[in-house]
Amino acid sequence: MISRVYHWKQFWCPRMGRMSLTDGGYLDDPDAEWGRFSNPDVVPFETIASLPCLGLLGEPGMGKTRTLQAQRTAIDTQVQEEGGQTLWLDLRSYGSEERLIRDLFGNQTFLAWASGTFCLHIFLDSLDPTLSRVVEHFLE
């Protein structure tokens, strides 16, 4: 099976934000005049990149992983230029909570951040509800 990658501009919308689709189910272009009016909550990644917590949610196969992979180098560069660090984990390979806890909360980058020396940007790909509860519990 050939996997095609379309280099479309992608937009983000808050979970409870307003998003307007056309009759055909397509997003009104947020960069166009009418699209800005009908989709005021829909923005490109650059607009929200500085927010302290972001979650890219959606159905399996929508391209969330590809989106993160495409942005990773730019994100790493920007974060490093600002004096921060990144920590990327693909949770698809985790079968146990213990391993996730060890690899995330025992990670040297995470431990250095916990001592308060820099801003840490954590990227968790393939976060399912079970694993999200583990992460939420330890961040409390």
Feature map (PLM): residue ranges:
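P-loop NTPase signaling cores
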Residues: 1-140
